[in-house]
């Protein structure tokens, strides 16, 4: 139960974003913001399965340790390092090919400034607030800002949604993909689980079992 909970939503969002919306190619560099959360961590895992070089960015070393365990090639602690400068340094100044942004806020512009020529910036969420971005950056870098709304896609294109589910389940069956569960609560612990999410203390996924 715990392993399957949320798989299709979080990992479905990621796979749809990276494959269909971001056109991530083998050998490209993927920068994941909010990489310590459930959705961000799924991007680290699936990015590696798709053959990308993955740079995981998160706010604590504990979260980054987990990202490294899950396959991240490089990490950035954006609570202590300048996100743009470090990402550019890790790519030899070229910038990243794809940004997977769960965070938004002030980090979104930093990540966009770290993107390379003809890069793709995937808008996934706004845990740090809805960002304001200078659109001239898209012209200067000839890059794309692309929204990823997996829930709406499943209703509009159920055939594609089924294909995504089949690919994900094949990875699960082969043992290549297994969602990380940071904590499991009973119904009586639901309030504590929600507090952990709101305080951004959780790493990976929290499951509430009936």
Language-model-detected regions and their locations in the chain:
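Mid-domain Rossmann-like dinucleotide-binding core that forms the NAD(H)/NADP(H) cofactor-binding site
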Residues: 1-81
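Phosphate-coordination loops involved in phosphoryl transfer and adenosine-cofactor binding
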Residues: 26-28, 96, 118
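NAD(P)H cofactor-binding loop motif with strongest signal on the N-terminal glycine-rich segment
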Residues: 34-35, 103, 126
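Glycine-rich phosphate-binding loop and adjacent beta-alpha segment
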Residues: 50, 61, 106-177, 202, ...
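Short amphipathic alpha-helix with an adjacent loop that forms part of the alpha/beta core around
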Residues: 82-93
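N-terminal Rossmann-like NAD(P) cofactor-binding module of classical short-chain dehydrogenase/reductase
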Residues: 99-100, 122
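Glycine/proline-rich active-site loop of Rossmann-fold NAD(P)-dependent oxidoreductases
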Residues: 197-204
């Amino acid at each position: 139960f715990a392993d399957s909970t949320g798989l299709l939503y979080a990992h479905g969002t990621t796979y749809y974003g990276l494959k269909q919306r971001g056109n991530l190619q083998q050998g490209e560099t993927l920068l994941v913001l909010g990489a310590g959360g459930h959705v961000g961590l799924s991007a680290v895992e699936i990015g590696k399965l798709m053959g990308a070089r993955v740079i995981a960015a998160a706010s604590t070393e504990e979260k980054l340790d987990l990202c490294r365990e899950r396959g991240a090639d490089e990490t950035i602690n954006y609570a202590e390092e300048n996100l743009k400068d470090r990402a550019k340094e890790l790519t030899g100044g070229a910038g990243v090919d794809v940004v997977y942004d769960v965070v938004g806020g002030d980090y979104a512009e930093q990540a966009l400034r770290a993107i390379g020529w003809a890069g793709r910036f995937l808008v996934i969420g706004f845990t740090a607030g809805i960002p304001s971005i200078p659109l001239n950056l898209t012209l200067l870098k000839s890059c794309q800002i692309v929204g990823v709304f997996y829930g709406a896609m499943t209703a509009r294109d159920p055939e594609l949604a089924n294909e995504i589910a089949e690919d994900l389940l094949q990875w699960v069956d082969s043992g290549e993909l297994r969602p990380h569960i940071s904590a499991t609560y009973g119904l009586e612990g639901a309030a504590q689980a929600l507090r952990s999410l709101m305080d951004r203390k959780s790493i990976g996924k929290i499951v509430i079992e009936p």
